[in-house]
Structures are given as C-alpha cells and as structure tokens.
Amino acid sequence: MSVGPACPQSLLGPEASNSRESSPMPEESYVSLQTSSADTLDTDTVSPLPSSMDLLIQDSPDSSTSPRVKPLSPSVEESTEKEETVPVKKQKIRTVFSQTQLCVLNDRFQRQKYLSLQQMQELSNILNLSYKQVKTWFQNQRMKCKKWQKNNWPRNSNGMPQGPAMAEYPGFYSYHQGCLVNSPGNLPMWGNQTWNNPTWSNQSWNSQSWSNHSWNSQAWCPQAWNNQPWNNQFNNYMEEFLQPGIQLQQNSPVCDLEATLGTAGENYNVIQQTVKYFNSQQQITDLFPNYPLNIQPEDL
C-alpha cells in the first residue's frame, strides 16, 4: 500500500475543495457585474450632447410649412395706439367785433398804439369785451401797421430804406366813417385823455404870427364891416338893379308879375353871392396885406 501518493491528495484535498468552493460565483455578484459592464458600454456608445446651434437649428421651424408670429414689444404697441388716436386740433374762436367797437378801437389805436394794463381794462369794460380780446386786437393791429410801413417805406436804388416814413397806417379809414364814436350816452369822450402824439406836443401854438395878431381889430368888428364904403355901394347897386322890376310890377298883369319876381329873386341871389365874394376878398386883404388877389392860373 502506498502512502506517498495519498498524502498529497490529502494535503491537496482541502485546498482543492476550497478552490472548488470559491470558483462558482454567486448570482448577485454576477448580476452586478453585468449591469456595470452594460453601463460602461452605454457610456461608450452614447453620442456627445448637441451644441446650442444644433438645438436652434432643430427647434427653428420651416417658414414655408409652419410660420410663427413673433409677439410685439410694448413700445411698438404704444406707437401703434398713438398713430390710431390722432389728436384733433382745436379751432381758434374768432371774435366778431361790431362796427361801433371797431371804430372805437381804431380811433384809440390811431391816437395811442400801446396801452397800459389799466387802459386796456377800461377799454374792455366800455366795449363789453375781455381784456385778452383787446390785447390781441392791438397786437395784431401793430403787426399790420409795421408790415404796411415796411412795404411802403421809400427805398433807394440799393433797396435800403431812406427818408422819412410814409403817412399813417390807413387801417382806420378802411372802416365806415359814419359810425358814431362819441355818441352821447353811448361811449365816453376821449378828449380828457392825455395823448403823446408828437404832432400835437411839438406844435408851437405860441407863435408870433398868432400871438402878435390883433384879433380885436376893426376888420373883425361887425360894425366896421357894415360901415365900409364898398358895402354902401353894393346896397345902392342892388336898389338900382331892382328898381325896374318894381316899376314893371306896378304896370304888368299877374302872370308877368310872377315872372318878374322870379327874375328879381335870381338877380338877388347873384348879388348876394357877389357880396359874399367881396367880403371874403376884403377879409383876405385885411389879414394878408401883401397877398396878390389877381392871380392867374399861369402864375401858379
């Protein structure tokens, strides 16, 4: 009987048993290994994540197949609303002045182109207008006056204004001249107003030609006029001229008498006009002794 070969078998028996016992793997570990290997395979085969451009290309639809409307921004919406609601301009209310109001306003403008606040208020109360209406009317009238003076100013060859200004702005004379500006009980007189018109302030009323004139002269006295010798001559001439008519009146029938009286009346009117003419001539000679009375049209 051989012991040698049996020993190694006995010795190797537990090791072999142990190896045999350890070789078969349990099911749980085998499943875990399979899942881990599958995960590794999946990570290897999965493609990389797409970039942002790829996402945009994929998400952007085709305009021909499915068009998409973009929402409007709030600023664009406000602009469209403003365009739809166009503001309507308010029409200016035109003041219709009466003829009397226009006459008073133009008369005051000719005298004084710039009024103070108190003067405008007084004028508006008189004309039953508002202060703004009077102020606006004066402003418009001043603009018209300046424009008229600019267009009518005398100019030289170079187009520059020269010489004094033209006459006053004729805006007042374009209105009706027959309106009663200072009618009693209607509107107050402007005589008490102090006007700053240079034509009145610069006038020399105390001239020698006026102050040295003797107004109490016999030339202006009625008695002196009646006592003039030429007056008696005209009276005698009138009596001599009417004397034949009086004689015909006594020796003529009624129809001839009427004709004679008509002729005498016409002659009397002619004589009266002649007397008035000579009276005026005598007044001229008394006032202006050196004034030539027999002026012919060729001498002018």
Curated annotation (Swiss-Prot):
* Ranges for the sequence repeats: 190-194, 195-199, 200-204, 205-209, 210-214, 215-219, 220-224, 225-229, 230-234
GO MF terms held by the record: chromatin binding; DNA-binding transcription activator activity, RNA polymerase II-specific; DNA-binding transcription factor activity; DNA-binding transcription factor activity, RNA polymerase II-specific; DNA-binding transcription repressor activity, RNA polymerase II-specific; lysine-acetylated histone binding; RNA polymerase II cis-regulatory region sequence-specific DNA binding; RNA polymerase II sequence-specific DNA-binding transcription factor recruiting activity
UniProt keywords (A-Z) are: Activator, Developmental protein, DNA-binding, Homeobox, Nucleus, Repeat, Repressor, Transcription, Transcription regulation
According to the UniProt record, where is the region Sufficient for strong transactivation activity? 235-300
One GO cellular-component annotation of the UniProt record comes to: chromatin
State the Gene Ontology BP annotations.
BMP signaling pathway; cell dedifferentiation; cell differentiation; embryonic pattern specification; gene expression; gonad development; mesodermal cell fate commitment; negative regulation of BMP signaling pathway
Bias (Polar residues) ranges:
31-50
Give me the ranges of the annotated region Required for DNA-binding.
Answer: 117-146
Output the SMART domains linked to this UniProt entry: HOX
Task: Extract the ranges annotated as region (9 X repeats starting with a Trp in each unit).
Answer: 190-234
Q: Where is this region: Disordered?
A: 1-86
Where located?
Nucleus
Q: Which residues form a coiled coil?
A: none
Q: Where is this region: Sufficient for transactivation activity?
A: 190-234
Question: Using the chain's own numbering, where are the disulfide bonds?
Answer: none
**InterPro entries from the xrefs?**
Distal-less_Homeobox_TF, HD, Homeobox_CS, Homeodomain-like_sf
> Hey, which family's this protein in?
Belongs to the Nanog homeobox family.
Subunit architecture? Interacts with SMAD1. Interacts with SALL4. Interacts with ZNF281/ZFP281. Interacts with PCGF1. Interacts with ESRRB; reciprocally modulates their transcriptional activities. Interacts with NSD2.
| Physiological role | Transcription regulator involved in inner cell mass and embryonic stem (ES) cells proliferation and self-renewal. Imposes pluripotency on ES cells and prevents their differentiation towards extraembryonic endoderm and trophectoderm lineages. Blocks bone morphogenetic protein-induced mesoderm differentiation of ES cells by physically interacting with SMAD1 and interfering with the recruitment of coactivators to the active SMAD transcriptional complexes. Acts as a transcriptional activator and repressor.
- Tell me the protein's name: Homeobox protein NANOG
Annotated source species: Bos taurus (Bovine)
